[in-house]
Every structure is written in structure tokens, then in C-alpha cells.
């Protein structure tokens, strides 16, 4: 079932079959499945992320999750564009996050762009906590302060 692979998404047919069988068994018990890939060290284009999440969906996952990287302003702009494309193209809930030196803004606005889940910490009083995640209080403040959601945009 476990098949370590680049970008945390196996292409091994036997491993894929086992994943799909397990997902079916989980669904039979009435539960939902989130499939998650972390490639925090790599920048991925919108097209690469969309294809990756479509593969997760094809395996039966109910919620699709991916974490990529944003270390430059251009990468951040592409991450924002990617989240909006995912919101338009996918028919399942998704979580699109990024890590990196330019990732913090996306952590705050991801839910406004269509990401189903945001991650936050209570506070930064422990040295082990990553500062990439906002605090619950600051995330809530930002989300409540922006009276906009991508689903409210009417394309002409």
C-alpha cells in the first residue's frame, strides 16, 4: 500500500489498486477519505497541481489535498492562480496550501479562494511551532475582514 514516490503520489499500478480498495472499504464504513501530498520543497504550476489532484480524485478520495512551495513573488502569484483554478475545475472539496518564504499570504486567503480547510495554531509559544501557519485569532480576523469569496465572482 505504501509506495514512496516523488511528489507523494504513486504511479505503481499495484499500489494504486490497493489504495482504491482501501478507499472503497473506508467508504463502505460511511467515512470520507482525504488524500494528501506534501511537496513543500517543490514549486508546481497550476496545471501540475490540477493534474495531481485529479489523480487523487480518480482513486476515490473525497477531499483532495496538496502542499507545494512559494519562495518568490511569482511563485506566490501562481499559487493564488492555482487555487482559483482548482475551485473552478474540481468537483470535490480541496485543500491547497503552500510553504516557503512567500507562503504566508496564501495561508490567510486560501479559504477565500476556495480551499476547504485552513490550518492555524493557537499561538507561537512553543519553539517547535512553525510560523508559516497563522494564529487562529489572526486567521479569523482576516477571513472576517474580507467581504469577498471567489464563488461570489460572476464571470462575464
Regions found by a protein language model. Name each.
Residues 2-156:
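Catalytic alpha/beta core domains of metabolic enzymes, predominantly
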